[in-house]
UniProtKB/Swiss-Prot annotation:
Keyword field: ATP-binding, Magnesium, Multifunctional enzyme, Nucleotide-binding, Nucleotidyltransferase, Transferase
Cofactor: Mg(2+)
A Gene Ontology cellular-component term: cytosol
Gene Ontology BP terms: regulation of glutamine family amino acid metabolic process
Species lineage: Bacteria, Bacillati, Actinomycetota, Actinomycetes, Mycobacteriales
InterPro entries: GlnE, GlnE_rpt_dom, NT_sf, PII_UdlTrfase/GS_AdlTrfase
One Pfam match: GlnE
Record family assignment: Belongs to the GlnE family.
Record region (Adenylyl transferase): 492-995
Protein's recorded name: Bifunctional glutamine synthetase adenylyltransferase/adenylyl-removing enzyme
């Protein structure tokens, strides 16, 4: 019979499982160390200490290796571990956190003693002395220099890591991030000093070494260094002679091979520039050539080692330039470019795991601090500090950001840097990448190394995931708030509680200018108008604006966007859903700011079709803007207009739905949700629906009650309407064909149909706040001089006898779009004999087309237009591509039925399939048509009115680039691509036309 032993007789030693050891050999390892032979309290405490190591199995394996090494003095170490809690905390924490430091201890088995007793971090002076003394000692024995200096460096990192990590295992004091980062910089300084001394000995031997100062920049300069980091330096010499250059180069070589990578890439001209310069040479460069980012780098400059007087002279000369960098003409453009570069550096698939460059990551915090320092440091010396933590504190104290916000940002920054330190310690490798979130073992290790404990609802790994999410969200929110909240405080009325007040109006204007606003005073007035009134709206706006303004600052035209947002907010003030949607759905707000800051066309539509804003969000299937089918909109538009007997009300109803659909299409286009071909088809669909609605309304208005229409009417779409390739600024090119009702003469039917067609054109063309609805019938036989409406027989007779080359060419894009469908199809069958004659068009007609094309190129381009950048009539533009396709259709459609197509793009496919033009040349034509169409659409979206000419370099061209879907807002880059694409296409056009 089994009897349970009394508690007093149970073994005290915890089992391997209770200790959390999962390695199959863990039990054997414990026995090998002799830790399972006794069950006294000392051994129990020892084992529980081991269990708290971030990776207890890894720590145990290194302990076994130490025990096996005769140089360790295992008996002494074992006794110390049993009796000294602080040693256990430091050693177990290090061995469970860093495989590399474990290897260092095994290779240097007496170094464990550095973690014993009352351990304190050595001073900067003591570190310098120990490293330089060793450098002097090993200079005579260079063979051992690297090993001994590296071991000294690792020993100091070991001591720091032991103190930094000890609290994860035992109740030991916690070192602050600032202490750890500053001490790492002190170690780096000492290592640089040792490398410099060795370099001087190697290069100069017994001669006096040159006066050389090493300026630390980056994290080392700011004394906020990582455990593993490149050390960025700039060299300053009294004379930039070959000896100084050799000493600097040798110092970099020694340091990089012994301690860490030394990088001089931030020097003037970067890696292409001289390694060493004099103070005067530095001054000349920064006065004349330096970019904004180079001044930003100098924010953290510090004379680290070498000639102290020379280093201070360098700083005294250069730092005043740093604090006036914001006055430079290109400051704003370069700041915006720096922001874009940060975002584009990280591949999308790892962005969520990137501590440094990901959204809500370390670079977001550092960018905020540095930009605000550059903007306001000119007039406030309290901001002349180097480290990110000190800068945020100073900004809070100075009223440039809220004190609480500064404290929160510092806390988030220090947490993210803590994780970065732990990740780097593991293998002493430079990394900023979090483990895969579903890698349970790796996430749990990181959580334990960062001293994150379970809370009852989550284990340590779960707590880390939650904390990361919280910190990233907080940084992202504060990133916007720190830029804009103080601006609101500077203009808010006394009765509106936003936060503390501090920033002057001049400082607010400087900050807005740095964030991309060309009219900062006007922008402040708009902001004041949004928050300076009583009630809930002002309070909600004060909460929303920091985030909205941050998103808006990334748009090409934040000034125009802010004005549009103010107008929209004032117009929608009675709509309760508007502000609550922006508050509760960040995706809607972000997309709206992009649209408002890019386009003049869509905001005007949104003022009268605000419900489209509610579709800026996402559903489970994707963006709501794409849930609407153009065909469904067309049916709804026709049905809505059909409910009214009054033609004006019918057309007003059609305009309302068209307005909403244009707002939807334009929004989706600007947000990159639609391809250009989808945009063209959707715009064509809504135009056709408007034509159908207007035609039906006018037929009803001209038909007596109880009577019947005197004729059937079909509307034939021509040009881009016929090809379903309309753009935002396109008119509707049409022809009308009628068929009199039975008992009605042709003359009566034509007269009645002409009245209907005239009314359609007039009513749709009535001036309106909406984009115009111009109906153009000038492509009909005889142009403006010909009858507006003809019967089928009249068309047949005319085309059989009188058709001119341009009229035949125009028929290539004829397509029945509205009115009587059967009549429209009969018209198309009739004109097929003209546009696709059995034997092809005559050589005279082809010659005439070529002659007209040459005349168009020389005469139709507007006066003053640039032929290289006119999207419609310019070199390689839309007209060039379309005329080329139409010439090939005229020459070959009688033999190739696939060319019986009104679409330019689909006809290009047929041309390639039939090998009428080489496939690579067809690709050039297609690319040019798509590029020009995107650009032409973008011009309307940006300017708000039809135009075909690309603007010159500047903000408007940048906006066109963004609206056209270019991958950034670099208008110059976009324009270069446009010119390249159209130039290549023009060569193909000339080849086809034989010119």
């Amino acid at each position: 019979m089994n009897v349970t032993k009394p508690a007093t007789q149970r073994p005290k030693l915890p089992s391997v499982g209770r200790l959390g050891l999962v390695d199959a050999l863990a039990g054997a390892h414990l026995a090998e160390l002799g830790w399972t032979e006794h069950d006294d309290q000392a051994h129990v405490d020892l084992l529980w200490s081991l269990s708290r190591a971030p990776d207890a199995d890894a720590a145990l394996k290194v302990l076994v290796r130490l025990a096996e090494n005769p140089d360790t003095g295992w008996d002494e170490l074992n006794a110390a571990l049993l009796n000294e809690r602080s040693l256990r905390g430091r050693l177990f924490a290090v061995l469970g956190s860093s495989l590399s430091l474990g290897d260092h201890l095994v290779a240097n088995p007496q170094s464990w003693k550095l973690l014993r007793g009352k351990v304190a971090l050595p001073s900067h002076a003591a570190l310098l002395e120990s490293f330089v003394d060793l450098a002097e000692e090993v200079a005579a024995a260079p063979a051992s220099a690297v090993h001994r200096l590296r071991a000294l460096h690792r020993d100091h990192v070991l001591v720091l890591a032991g103190l930094d990590l000890a609290a994860t295992v035992e109740d030991e004091p916690v070192l602050s991030f600032t202490v750890v980062a500053a001490h790492l910089a002190d170690i780096a300084d000492a290592a640089l000093a040792a490398a410099l001394r060795l370099a001087e000995k190697t290069v100069c031997r017994d001669r006096t070494p040159p006066r050389l100062a090493v300026i630390a920049v980056g994290k080392c300069g700011a004394r906020e260094l990582n455990y593993v980091s490149d050390v960025d330096v700039i060299f300053v010499a009294e004379r930039a002679d070959p000896i100084s250059i050799r000493v600097a180069g040798e110092m970099m070589r020694v340091a990089s091979s012994t301690f860490f990578e030394v990088d001089a890439g931030l020097r003037p001209e970067g890696r292409s520039g001289e390694l060493v310069r004099t103070v005067e040479s530095h001054i000349a460069y920064y006065q004349r050539w330096a970019k904004t980012w180079e001044f930003q780098a100098l924010l953290k400059a510090r004379a680290a080692v070498g000639d102290a007087e020379l280093g201070q002279r360098y700083l005294a000369a250069l730092m005043p330039m740093v604090w006036t960098a914001c006055e430079r003409d290109d400051f704003v453009a370069e700041v915006q470019a720096m922001r874009r570069r940060v975002e584009q550096l990280v591949p999308a698939d790892i962005r969520g795991r990137e501590l440094k460059l990901g959204t809500g990551g370390l670079r977001d915090v550092e960018f905020v601090a540095q930009l605000l320092q550059l903007v306001h440091g000119r007039s406030d010396e309290s901001l002349h500090v180097a480290s990110t933590v000190d800068a945020l504190s100073a900004l809070g104290e100075g009223g440039y950001i809220g004190r609480e916000d500064a404290a929160n940002m510092i806390a988030s920054y220090e947490f993210l840097r803590l994780l970065e330190h732990r990740l780097q310690l593991q293998r002493l490798k430079r990394t900023h990448l979090l483990p895969e979130f579903d890698d349970e073992e790796a996430v749990r290790w990181l959580a334990r190394a960062a001293h994150i404990r379970p809370d009852g609802r989550h284990d340590a790994a779960g707590m880390l995931r939650e904390e990361l999410k919280h910190q990233n969200v907080r940084v992202s929110r504060l990133h916007a708030k720190l830029f804009y909240q103080p601006l609101l405080e500077s203009i808010a009325p006394a009765g509106l509680e936003i936060a503390g007040r501090g920033m002057t109006s001049e400082a607010a204007e400087r900050q807005l200018a740095a964030l991309g606003y060309e009219g900062p005073q006007t922008a402040l007035k708009h902001m004041a108008a949004l928050v300076n009134h009583s009630g809930r709206r002002a309070r909600v706006q004060s909460v929303l604006l920091p985030r909205l303004l941050d998103w808006l600052s990334y748009a090409p035209d934040p000034d125009g966007g802010l004005l549009a947002y103010r107008r929209l907010s004032e117009a929608l003030a009675p709509q309760s859903w508007y502000l609550s949607t922006l508050r509760d759905k960040p995706t809607v707000g972000r997309r709206l700011m992009h649209v408002l800051g890019t386009s003049a066309f869509v905001p005007d539509l949104l003022m009268r079709a605000p419900e489209v804003i509610q579709n800026y969000g996402d559903s489970r299937t994707g963006p709501k803007l794409l849930e609407t089918e153009p065909a469904a909109v067309a049916r709804a538009l026709i049905a809505s207009a059909g409910r009214y007997s009054d033609p004006l009300r019918a057309i007003a109803a059609a305009r309302t739905l068209r307005r909403r659909e244009l707002a939807r299409i334009g929004s989706a286009d600007l947000l990159g949700l639609l391809e250009v071909t989808e945009v063209c088809r959707a715009l064509t669909s809504v135009w056709v629906a408007v034509l159908q609605s207007a035609l039906e309304a006018m037929i009803r208005a001209n038909t007596p009650e109880g009577g019947r229409p005197l004729a059937r009417i079909a509307v034939i779409g021509m040009g881009r309407l016929g090809g379903s390739e309309l753009s935002y600024g396109s008119d509707a090119d049409v022809m009308y064909v009628c068929e009199p009702a039975s008992g009605v003469t042709d003359a009566q039917g034509v007269k009645w149909s002409t009245a209907v067609a005239e009314q359609v054109r007039a009513k749709l063309g009535t001036p309106s706040v909406d984009p115009p609805l111009e109906v153009d019938a000038n492509l009909r036989p005889e142009g403006r001089n010909g009858p507006l409406v003809r019967t089928l027989a009249s068309y047949g007779a005319y085309y059989a006898q009188w058709a001119q080359a341009w009229e035949i060419q125009a028929l290539l894009r004829a397509h029945a779009v509205a009115g009587d469908a059967a009549l429209g199809q009969r018209f198309l069958l009739l004109v097929d004999h003209t546009r696709y004659p059995p034997d092809g068009v005559s050589a005279e007609a082809v010659h005439e087309i070529r002659r007209i094309k040459a005349r168009v190129e020389s005469e139709r381009l507007p006066r003053g237009a640039d032929p290289n950048t006119h999207t419609k009539l310019g070199r390689g533009g839309l007209a060039d591509i379309e005329w080329t396709v139409q010439l090939l259709q005229l020459q070959n459609a009688h033999e190739i039925e696939a060319l019986h197509n009104t679409s330019t793009l689909e006809s290009l496919d047929a041309i390639a399939e039939a090998k009428l033009v080489a496939e690579d040349e067809v690709k050039l034509l297609r690319q040019a048509w798509l590029t020009a169409t995107r650009a032409r659409n973008a011009l309307v979206l940006v300017r708000g009115k039809p135009t075909d000419q690309l603007p010159g370099p500047g903000r408007q061209l940048n906006a066109v680039a963004v609206a056209a879907g270019w991958h950034n807002d670099d208008g110059g880059e976009f324009l270069d691509n446009y010119l390249r694409v159209t130039r290549r296409a023009k060569a193909v056009v000339r080849k086809v036309f034989g010119s």
